[in-house]
Curated annotation (Swiss-Prot):
One Gene Ontology cellular component annotation held by this UniProt entry: small ribosomal subunit
Lineage: superkingdom: Bacteria
Molecular function in Gene Ontology: small ribosomal subunit rRNA binding; structural constituent of ribosome
Name of this chain's protein: Small ribosomal subunit protein bS20
Single GO BP term: translation
Pfam families recorded: Ribosomal_S20p
Length: 88
């Protein structure tokens, strides 16, 4: 553990940020799973609504600094392709 005040505070902040990011990523993964379940059920209306929710969460993760913008772009593209595959 850190001996002086500044590194100790940084360690506390890093842990708090880690837990916050972990919770947000868990929320995001749950939303993606719900979307994929709607895709499997081939429910187009539900899937399109879930895609909007997932896209919103992904975009917010960029702003919060949780995910990189290229990572988010790749995820959004893959999820959109899944929706397009059942809509045809």
């Amino acid at each position: 553990m850190a001996k002086s005040k500044t590194p100790a505070k940084r360690a506390r902040r890093a842990e708090a940020n880690r837990l916050r990011n972990k919770a947000y990523k868990s929320k995001l993964k749950t939303a993606i799973k719900n979307y994929e379940n709607a895709i499997i059920a081939e429910d187009l209306d539900t899937a399109s609504n879930k895609l909007l929710q997932v896209t919103s969460l992904l975009d917010r993760s960029i702003t919060k600094g949780i995910l990189h913008k290229n990572n988010v772009a790749r995820k959004k593209s893959a999820l959109s392709k899944k929706l397009n595959s059942i809509s045809q």
